[in-house]
């Protein structure tokens, strides 16, 4: 019987464990480490704080961050400030969801399975595709997995990706491709969109697929109909990375004939959280159903004829046959997928369209204000909620100045492209007011 039942790692615990493994002391466990490199001094740690004192100190540190509750944010580039209905946190905090893991036992996991099924259904409907999986880690890894699928399906070892795809997603793809010995070629961007002529020249018999973003990194809406025709005439797959909120207004990629549609559902119910964790989605046509990575939940009936939900087509997955799995993704983002599901269900179809329309209207209002003030605004008016403004000063310097005025500025495009030095990618969501937009434009007057 343990002497100290509720106190872990007592001397008694240590002795019992050492006895079991036949070692006399803890030092004996580390005998392989040379004496001269062992740390033998006392740890120079400050005295422990009480809980109230610790909370005060952590709150003080946290207050140094510029958060989107107190600051007007015009920063996007893949992570956006959107309204999150209060019901989202209430639902995902329920213990049945919050502590749930992969629902391998359907007879005791119907609630979780149905929640995942609803997420799949809504994503499939938004993207115009036949089916969607239960989630991926984020938009970038979903894009990379899509390229791996395309290569495996076509038995080709080269992927083309538009230069107007988010650079970070492009880098994730290149990382994945290295291990699979897949070549990645970037098709240059021209005037904020994919260079069509360059794509025509690059298409060949060894191309597995072409990756395009819709709307793209610069906010522009790519001509999917034209791209689809070129790609499919080459017997390659069309892979589209999309902002799901924009699909409340834009024609879904599936209606243009996309083979795979991926993206990140952060725009629905998931906070920015310094860049993650978020929630990727992955939608395909029926012909690719058995090659989809990750979990798939299907609807069925039990022996009594009652509707039920189960994990289906599991032979694709690594927990069944690791060496033959379509992907080695295991745990997914089910909790964040639930958050997105609750947010979408709360909005409803009408609310989602209204939210998308507010993004469109407010961003176009902001662009017009910049033009009225004499700023150079790049590219066409065919954008959703992001556009590019050219300034006369370094964006880093401008953004530091904006912070002093309670504004989080846009993304510094010069970080990735030298030709876009002093160019700011501005995102305007439904959260921004007319007064905030006007103040933002006025604050940039000195950098015109």
From Swiss-Prot:
SUPFAM superfamilies: PLP-dependent transferases. It holds the Pfam family GDC-P. Its EC number is 1.4.4.2. It is an enzyme of class 1 (oxidoreductase). InterPro entries: GcvPA, GDC-P_N, GDC_P, PyrdxlP-dep_Trfase, PyrdxlP-dep_Trfase_major, PyrdxlP-dep_Trfase_small. Keywords: Oxidoreductase. One of its GO terms (biological process) is nucleoside metabolic process. It catalyses: N(6)-[(R)-lipoyl]-L-lysyl-[glycine-cleavage complex H protein] + glycine + H(+) = N(6)-[(R)-S(8)-aminomethyldihydrolipoyl]-L-lysyl-[glycine-cleavage complex H protein] + CO2. One of its GO terms (molecular function) is glycine dehydrogenase (decarboxylating) activity. The keyword Transport does not apply. The glycine cleavage system is composed of four proteins: P, T, L and H. In this organism, the P 'protein' is a heterodimer of two subunits. The glycine cleavage system catalyzes the degradation of glycine. The P protein binds the alpha-amino group of glycine through its pyridoxal phosphate cofactor; CO(2) is released and the remaining methylamine moiety is then transferred to the lipoamide cofactor of the H protein. NCBIfam families: PRK00451.1. Belongs to the GcvP family. N-terminal subunit subfamily. This is Probable glycine dehydrogenase (decarboxylating) subunit 1. The lineage of its organism: Bacteria, Bacillati, Bacillota, Bacilli, Bacillales.
